[in-house]
Amino acid sequence: MFNYSRRNKIPFHISTQASVANIASAKFYKKLGAERIILARELNLKQVKELKGILPLEAFVHGAMCVAVSGRCFTSQFLFGRSANRGVCIHPCRRSYIIKDKQEGYELELDNDKVMSAKDLCMLPYVEEMKKAGIFSFKIEGRGRDPRYVDAVVREYRKALDKRLTKAEVIEGMKELERVFNRKFSTGFYLGKPTPKDFSDIEHSAATESKEYVGKIVHFYSNAKAGSIKIESNEIKVGDEICIIGNTTGIEKMKIESMQVNNLPVQVGKRGDEVAIKLPERVRKNDDVYVIIRK
């Protein structure tokens, strides 16, 4: 594959699953023609800095962490025939487990029975340190995440890459990241070896916000900057924060200041209503509408 790529002038990067963790392996892949290395997840920042200058370095900065070394896990494949290396892992590491005595079959439930479920990586407060260590490309894990997650995480790290964040901006950024899917946060190996505190006890998500489907956009009037929502589920009220998601629109968030049904002002829109509201940004017919629920 390396020979084929070089012969056809196809650039290639070395995956984190190659576990590049030292100078010798970095130089080895450079000699083979690699243009970039995605570093092993088990390196601390001091070790990363030692690889600076050999090849451009990419590293994970945020997202779910596999309990296996650099993600080389076969548990899902072995138990369920779903290979993590083919993108279809069903995450058996996130399940609850018990200890079983082989001799008598006695079972013990652990205090934290999620013995393989790591917290999510979050390095937002340490982006500057990662830059100084030589990392120039920041990798976000987000397989299977919804548009709100992608929007929030990319937005916050984009800010951190564009300029050095103040302490207040980091705090506000962390609040934004906590609003979307997470299993609580850890710095992984970057600041030292993980401890038991870096394992999660969360069943699903520790997000401080969730979203409930409301309905779809049925009209949008660009000149008036207004449109209407057909409510198919639940209800919306004046003062609610909503997000509108569509393939072309992306994600737009706004607070409902006023609503009308049949040209009459209302405080609540119920299932079956077509509710007219102001829409400051362009949206499109059939975009999905969700109300944001704060926990």
Residue ranges and their predicted role:
Residues 11, 27, 35-295:
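Surface-exposed amphipathic alpha-helical tracts and adjacent flexible/coil segments at the periphery
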Residues 1-28:
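N-terminal active-site wall of soluble small-molecule enzyme domains
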